[in-house]
Each structure stands twice: as C-alpha cells, then as structure tokens.
UniProtKB/Swiss-Prot annotation:
It holds the Pfam family FERM_M. This is FERM domain-containing protein 6. Its main location: cytoplasm. Residues 16-320 form the FERM domain. It comes from Rattus norvegicus (Rat). It is a peripheral membrane protein. It comes from the Eukaryota. GO terms for cellular component: apical junction complex; cytoplasm; cytoskeleton; plasma membrane. PROSITE patterns: FERM_3.
Amino acid sequence: MNKLTFHNNKVMQDRRRVCIFLPNDKSVSIIINVKILCHQLLVQVCDLLRLKDSHLFGLSVIQNNEHVYMELSQKLYKYCPKEWKKEASKGIDQFGPPMIIHFRVQYYVENGKLISDRIARYYYYWHLRKQVLHSQCVLREEAYFLLAAFALQADLGNFKRKVHHGDYFEPEAYFPAWVVSKRGKDYILKHIPNMHRDQFALTASEAYLKYIKEAVRLDDVAIHYYRLYKDKREVEGSLTLGLTMRGIQIFQNLEEEKQLLYDFPWTNVGKLVFVGKKFEILPDGLPSARKLVYYTGCPTRSRHLLQLLSNSHRLYMNLQPVLRHLR
C-alpha cells in the first residue's frame, strides 16, 4: 500500500495552525480546517478553556491597530492573511507560522454577577486587568490602588505577613505605567500590602466581582476604540469612535490624548446609518439636519462597526431589566 505524503494529502493541505491569544497572557495552538466557520472555532476554544457561556466574548484579528471582531457565521479564511490561506501544510509538525487570533471581551457589562459561568468571569476579569494597564484617568488615581488590592486578593489569596513582603508582586502588572512612574515602585510596595490585607477573607470570585465593578467605572477601560474620518479626503483619521456599555462617544484626536466631543447614551441615539464609507448618527428628537456625518474609510469597516454597535445596543436594552433586579 502506498503511503500518501502530507503534501499530497488533500485533508492535510486544508489544515492550518492558529494561535489564540487569551486575556491572561497565555495562548493555545489549534490545528483547524482552513474552511472552518468562525463559530466552530469559538466553540473549540471555549471547549479547551471549559468555558460554558461565551456570549460576551468574541474572536478578533488586529487590522491597522484595531481589533476586528469576526462575524461568527463567516468562514475563518475571510479574516486570514492571504499567505496563510495559500500555504500548503508540509506535515504534522511543519504548518508554518500560525494565524494570530485574539479571544477577548466583545461586549462589556457593568456588573460581574451577570456572568454566571466561573471561567467566563475569570477571563472577563483578566481582560479588564489588561485594559486597566493602559488606562489614563489621572483624576482617579486612587482607583488603581483599590483595583490592585482586589487583584492581589484574587491572584494570591489572603495576605500572609511571612510570605507577602518586599517585592511580592510586580507593580507594572497591576498599575498603568504612568502611576508607577509618578509614585515609584517603593511607594507602591510600601502602601499596597495594607490594602491587600483589608481584603481578607474575600474569595477569588468575590474579588473578581469587586474588581469588575470598580474597573468599569474608569472611563477608558470598558470601551472599544475605532478610527473615524471627518471627510472622504482625510488620510489619517482625526476622530475616534468609542463604543461603551451605555452608548457611543466621539473624540477629537489630539497629539497625546483624545478630547471628548459627543457622548450619546443608547437612549439618545435615534438612528445609526452606514452607507458605503459613510457613517451617520441621528440623535433622538433632533431634525435630520442635525445629524452627524463621518466616514469609516471602507465599506467593510462600515459593516463591521454597524454589526458591533447594533449588537451592543441590543445587549444593553436586554440587560436593563436584569440590572434593575440586581440593584
């Protein structure tokens, strides 16, 4: 009997390797069929993580420094690099460079109790941990110290004097770089242990809940940013769309910061329209002449943003009765 080489084996030629980056800085590598649906890949990832409730999570690829979330009904190759799709696999250990995919939070919620699955809550917490490291809320500096105390309780458990002293944690793993630079490591390592001690007897799950509740109060943590253009001729987007739990924000891009121009809660958004590259926001109760018109750069980005905004709005409206009950 002749042995088929991997190069000639059609089944193996359709196999590719993907590397899934997780919120907790770990990754998983999966061999998949190049024609797999995004939904099927998400199911495989969740099975590996033993995550039962994935409705707040999605798979994304980075394009032009933005996370593009996959439409789960689409085939994966719609999002993959051309070289990755074309390359024939050369053997079980020779699949070539993997496609990089991110498993991350796609839809934010303000209350961790809405996440009943223990594993899902864990990864939601870790996603926020990473977002906090990039946060720039300079007027809320005390919040970062409280968040670090919750995170240390979640990660290390109860404070133990004989174990938790000196450099028992890395400040850079818990604080934005500007806080570490401003206060210094010695200051943080001196004051945080007492705050860690104050969380005594909190379980990891309870610490996650407290962390989530405090983290989403920071304006730049539970938010997705996407570049927008003022007109068709702009090359560098001078505006940024911020998608939050509660609505849409429009920012002017300055040299080192974003200046908030508009803040539209979902209850004040009358209509969103995407036509080709054009993006229109019609605030509720205002005449059509008062609509805001921006540009996305290409129809594909328009479609992606429309789906993301529509799904976020739908989730927000559906969760309001549940949130009122939790309060």
